[in-house]
UniProtKB/Swiss-Prot annotation:
Signal peptide: none annotated. Keywords: ATP synthesis, Cell membrane, CF(1), Hydrogen ion transport, Ion transport, Membrane, Transport. The keyword Lyase does not apply. GO terms for biological process: proton motive force-driven plasma membrane ATP synthesis. Belongs to the ATPase gamma chain family. Pfam families: ATP-synt (PF00231). It comes from Symbiobacterium thermophilum (strain DSM 24528 / JCM 14929 / IAM 14863 / T). The keyword Transport applies. It is a peripheral membrane protein. One of its GO terms (molecular function) is ATP binding. NCBIfam families: ATPsyn_F1gamma (TIGR01146). It comes from the Bacteria. This is ATP synthase gamma chain.
Length: 288
């Protein structure tokens, strides 16, 4: 019985130690989530308005073309799938959900495909299954900046402009809130500009210095902005999922500690009762 009590005490100490870790991780990711969520909320309206502006300019300037807008029709196009995952685990179903979506997309795709991974978890998953990414990015950190997104995208654009890939699709996780994140897929290249609304359909624009120069600046900036937003969405989703997972783990640890404490108290009570019974039995034997 003494050994049983000691074993329960060891388990209580172990669970309490784990609970301290999960609680600390929850607090850290809660702070990171607030910063990431603010970035997402700031980026969304900018991306939306930039898409509308680009759509109006392209629709108004008929005949204007740009390499990032041009859809290649010759031959069988090669599609690059860009997968955004985390470098670390302990984030609930965040990684496996988006990886599953990427795996399904690759299996359903009838055209030749190439894989680009951002995050260690996605890379490791596909490398283990003999699918080697043509580009991989790991250890990018938690502070996603526009400069970082542009640096990553430039390497992807190089593949596109060189003709190695003809279409780029991104599989990422859309941030809804701390407990809800949705794996999604969108086409990044060639750019599909938003349709202009009726109020702007017949507006004539004056370009300075020229339509070509304006689009040469605006089109790459649009691609960079969209990719930056997707990276922010993914990072905010990661922090939200990890904060929720660590919160659940902390609560589960609390329940386990309560059950173990109850088991310990029962074992101690049983030991005390047995000792009292032995004392009473010994006293009765002496009196007899």
């Amino acid at each position: 019985m003494a050994e049983n009590k000691k074993a329960v005490q060891r388990r209580i100490r172990a669970v309490k130690s784990t609970q301290q870790i999960t609680k600390a991780m929850k607090m850290v990711d809660a702070a990171k989530l607030r910063r990431a969520q603010e970035k997402v909320q700031n980026a969304r309206p900018y991306s939306r308005e930039l898409a509308k502006t680009l759509g109006r300019l392209i629709q108004a300037g008929a005949g204007i073309d740009h390499p990032l807008l041009h859809r290649r029709t010759e031959g069988t196009p090669t599609v690059a799938y860009v997968l955004l995952t985390a470098d670390r685990g302990l984030a609930g179903a965040f990684n496996i959900n988006v990886i599953r979506k990427a795996h399904q997309a690759l299996q359903k795709e009838s055209r030749p495909t190439k894989l680009i991974t951002i995050g260690r978890k996605g890379r490791d998953y596909f490398v283990k299954r003999k699918i080697q990414p043509v580009l991989e990015f790991v250890n990018l950190g938690d502070n996603i900046t526009f400069a970082l997104a542009r640096s990553v995208l430039s390497k992807i654009v190089d593949l596109y402009l060189s003709g190695e890939v003809d279409e780029v699709r991104v599989i990422y996780t859309e941030f809804v809130n701390a407990v809800t994140q949705r794996p999604k897929e969108m086409q990044l290249l060639p750019i599909q500009p938003a349709q202009a609304d009726g109020a702007h359909t017949h507006v004539e624009y004056i370009y300075e210095p020229s339509p070509e120069r304006v689009l040469d600046t605006l089109v790459p900036r649009y691609a960079e902005t969209m990719f930056y937003q997707l990276m922010l969405e993914s990072k905010a989703s990661e922090h939200g999922a990890r904060m929720t997972a660590m919160g659940n783990a902390t609560d589960n640890a609390e329940e386990m500690i309560a059950k173990l404490t109850l088991a310990y108290n029962r074992a101690r009570q049983a030991a005390i009762t047995r000792e009292i019974s032995e004392i009473v039995g010994g006293a009765n034997a002496l009196q007899g």
